[in-house]
């Protein structure tokens, strides 16, 4: 417990120093359902994202680069995943399983985490995390070029949120960016739950 308290204290001091050195502004996208403290204005790019099971779904990347590093929020939209997997099932038949449409979505956090691990040279932190009782994962890694990545990944209603701050090794950890994500509804109100809503991970699933 003493070691944990030291980590928390050190993190708090880091965050304070970093907040002073860098101007943070709130950014919200009701369309994509999130709000976060950003280090500057985001550039927005729409991309095609190939899932672990090989289908292509739309994603939107919000990114900002400055002299401290690159900061991005990637929102991957898996909401049409089941339909795309059903189309593949009709093409392949018995060689393909109907459940893959749900598995692809439920495994998306682990898949995104693996991609971050694969590009790292060392991993300093790699564990479960949650925000507003929505399950996720956090990682802190060092890359071959000595930059450090502070990442957080969450899945909510078939949308995957990948928070990635890859920064210079000589600045304080950008924890403000990694840990300030909030989920919002179409009116911009913050979404919170009293319990863990497992059924809200994958949208459109028929309950039995």
Residue ranges of model-derived segments:
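Conserved polar/disulfide-associated segments of primarily extracytoplasmic proteins
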Residues: 48-149
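Short, solvent-exposed coil/turn segments at beta-strand boundaries
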Residues: 37-41, 66-68, 134, 154-161
